[in-house]
Design a protein with these regions (language model features):
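Domain-scale activation on soluble regions of proteins
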Residues: 1-157
Length: 157
């Protein structure tokens, strides 16, 4: 299922990019808590459960709330939740077996399931499009607004 893994991985990466950009916008607004520091944030994103779509979406929503921006639409949140449940650790579609202790491996997919790859790919595409084309655009516009405000302040406007 490499194609499904690639879709899922792209979604994970765009969530991480969104978290990093939202944190950067908060820092530019003057927030100084250590959790927003790029190195600290990278450690957190690479730490425990680094591939959890649910954890990444939760972190993103906390940051969006602090920026007073709209939360992810319920339909997107539901898609992320269902995709997370299907593959909570980013291993289900990547490996045929996963470590289950010292020298022990379990099937990555313990029960056989038939998956409509086309429908699943569409779910990934919809969530990815909202995040990459929608949310990252909103955050980019916010960055431009911050830059305009800074220019105006430096000119005494």
């Amino acid at each position: 299922m490499p194609i499904v893994y690639n879709y899922r991985h792209a979604l994970e990466l765009v969530l991480k990019a969104s978290v990093r950009e939202a944190a950067a916008r908060l820092r530019a607004d003057g927030a100084s808590d250590a959790s927003l520091d790029p190195a600290t944030l990278d450690e957190e994103l690479a730490g425990t459960k680094p591939h959890s779509l649910e954890r990444l979406a939760n972190k993103l929503e906390v940051l969006l709330d602090r920026l007073h921006l709209e939360q992810l639409p319920a339909t997107t949140r539901d898609k992320l939740r269902s995709l997370h449940q299907l593959d909570p650790h980013g291993e289900t579609f990547r490996y045929s077996t996963v470590k289950a202790g010292k020298g022990k491996f379990d099937p990555a997919r313990p029960t056989q399931e038939h998956i409509d790859v086309v429908a699943l790919a569409e779910q990934f595409r919809e969530a990815f499009t909202l995040l990459s084309g929608g949310l990252l655009t909103v955050l980019d516009n916010y960055r431009e607004y911050q830059a305009d405000q800074a220019r105006g302040a430096s000119l005494g406007i």
